[in-house]
């Protein structure tokens, strides 16, 4: 049973790492954490793995390089996803080779983000805290806005309804720009991530 619990925890951690490093908002969250480290709003030993316990200064000296790495990865993710979205939108004009190339570009950008996470040496617990934050600040507002948009679309047109619908759509577009994937893929991916995260937490409590 103990082996089974350890295996479930390992599977959850691996899946959480993989799935959280697919989103376009993830590099920004990592940069926010680096800012907190630099401003001493977060304890070093809570954020960074034991590898740097005896060499904190060396890690802090790398902060500018880490930020540049994350900015590059964020740009790469956004550009790759924009290219894929454009081809999918004009699928009739796109060749299978172009689509495969764009999909590969997105996958490569996500692989680069996963590698960036490893280079940052953040603890697993910190990654899970960021998942909680994304759940509160991105996922829940997103599905709430989607549901409200559906409700308003079914109502009769009025000044109040039209104004609220326009505001909801504007806020949804702002959130969509942070995802790095289609809304449907985001919901599916985040829900899978969240379920995996909870399985790992439940296994640890046993």
Feature map (PLM): residue ranges:
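Transcription initiation cofactors for RNA polymerase, centered on bacterial
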Residues: 1-206
């Amino acid at each position: 049973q103990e082996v089974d619990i350890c295996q479930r925890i390992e599977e959850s951690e691996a899946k959480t790492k993989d799935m959280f490093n697919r989103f376009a908002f993830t590099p920004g969250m990592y940069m926010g954490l680096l800012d907190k480290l630099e401003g001493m709003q977060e304890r070093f030993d809570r954020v960074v793995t034991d590898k740097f316990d005896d060499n904190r200064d060396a890690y802090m000296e790398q902060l500018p390089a880490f930020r540049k790495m994350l900015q590059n990865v964020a740009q790469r993710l956004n550009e790759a996803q924009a290219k894929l979205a454009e081809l999918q939108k004009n699928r009739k004009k796109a060749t299978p080779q172009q689509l495969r190339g764009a999909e590969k570009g997105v996958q490569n950008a996500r692989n680069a983000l996963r590698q960036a996470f490893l280079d940052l040496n953040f603890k697993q617990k910190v990654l899970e805290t960021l998942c909680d934050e994304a759940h509160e600040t991105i996922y829940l507002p997103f599905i709430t806005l989607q549901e409200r948009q559906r409700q308003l679309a079914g109502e009769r047109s009025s000044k109040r309804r039209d104004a609220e619908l326009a505001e909801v759509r504007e806020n949804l577009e702002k959130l969509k720009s942070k995802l790095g994937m289609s809304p449907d893929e985001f919901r599916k991916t985040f829900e899978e991530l969240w379920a995996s995260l909870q399985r790992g937490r439940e296994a640890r409590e046993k």
